[in-house]
From Swiss-Prot:
This is ADP-dependent (S)-NAD(P)H-hydrate dehydratase. Its cofactor is Mg(2+). HAMAP family: NADHX_dehydratase. It comes from the Bacteria. It comes from Staphylococcus aureus (strain NCTC 8325 / PS 47). Residues 7-274 form the YjeF C-terminal domain. GO terms for molecular function: ADP-dependent NAD(P)H-hydrate dehydratase activity; ATP binding; NAD(P)HX epimerase activity. It is an enzyme of class 4 (lyase). Belongs to the NnrD/CARKD family. It catalyses: (6S)-NADHX + ADP = AMP + phosphate + NADH + H(+); (6S)-NADPHX + ADP = AMP + phosphate + NADPH + H(+). InterPro entries: Carbohydrate_kinase_pred_CS (IPR017953), CARKD (IPR000631), Ribokinase-like (IPR029056). Coiled coil: none annotated.
């Protein structure tokens, strides 16, 4: 592969220091779309990951049953009804980066949410596609928008999206599939692989203690937040992915399993430690 994300590589990428005269509008306007009536935890983890990663303004479009929990667990985020198309259109227009998928569900409502987003997203925006949204993309096979698109599949989701069975997912076949797809891909696995248009990277840190539900939602939120804050997409994706595994590996030294909510709490401390 093209290179390895190690601490040395991250040092050259770095997490930028915040400017003294900055304000919340300088750190990304984020929209998260997901969380069906039964899967609200996924979008909540993603939202909290955005908050703890430093996003300036966060809006969550989710099922009304999740609103009270979000207000309680993530008061920093604004919350709107995912079914309110007028408000959703307004928020899409105001947003820099959009994450769709965590807890979205794969029924017709999820299909409709993706179709609506693709009709309204603009070329200057960033789109991060995770979880259920990847499954829906695999079924609908819509034309990708002209904005910058990042997919964050685990191995089974990548099988659906690429058509490559898990046991046949070699680097060469994955690279060919990414080229056909025409997007950035963060393939979540032991030794996560990141595919860009012109080069690829393999993560060399992490821990099996991170193999728990919600960890991918957390990573998707971090990637969305970093991409919304930092100008260079490649550096943002690599920095978010590295930081996620960096925290997990460190926590695993003292914890048998690393809950995503615990990892989220450590994000700002790790970012400070890795700050340029």
């Amino acid at each position: 592969m093209g290179g390895y994300i190690t601490m040395e590589t991250l040092n050259s990428i770095n997490i930028p220091k915040r400017k003294e005269d900055s304000h919340k509008g300088d750190y990304g306007k984020i929209l998260l779309i997901g969380g069906s009536a039964n899967l609200g935890g996924a979008i909540m983890l993603a939202a909290r990951a955005c908050v703890f990663s430093g996003s300036g303004l966060i809006t969550v479009a989710t099922h009304p049953t999740n609103h009270s929990a979000l207000h309680s667990r993530c008061p920093e985020a604004m919350v709107i009804d995912i079914n309110d198309t007028k408000m959703l259109t307004k928020m899409i227009e105001m947003t820099d980066s959009i994450l769709i998928g965590p807890g979205l569900g794969v029924d017709f409502k999820g299909n409709n949410a993706i179709t609506f987003l693709l009709q309204n997203i603009q070329p200057h925006q960033n789109l991060i596609v995770d979880g259920d949204a990847i499954t829906i993309f695999s079924k609908l096979k819509p034309q990708l928008p002209t904005c910058r698109v990042i997919f964050t599949p685990h191995l089974k989701e990548w099988e659906r999206l690429s058509g490559i069975p898990i046991e046949e997912q070699t680097y060469e076949r994955n690279r060919e599939a990414v080229d056909r797809l025409g997007a950035t891909v963060v393939l979540k696995k032991h030794g996560t692989e990141i595919f860009f248009k012109d080069e690829d990277f393999k993560l060399t840190i992490g821990s099996p203690a991170m193999a728990t539900g919600g960890m991918g939602d957390t990573l998707a939120g971090m990637i969305t937040s970093f991409v919304g804050q930092f100008d260079n997409l490649k550096e943002a994706v690599m920095s978010a992915t590295y930081t996620h595994s960096f925290i997990g590996e460190n926590l695993a030294k003292d914890m048998y399993v690393v809950p995503p909510s615990r990892l989220i709490n450590e994000i700002p401390y790790a970012m400070k430690q890795l700050e340029s």
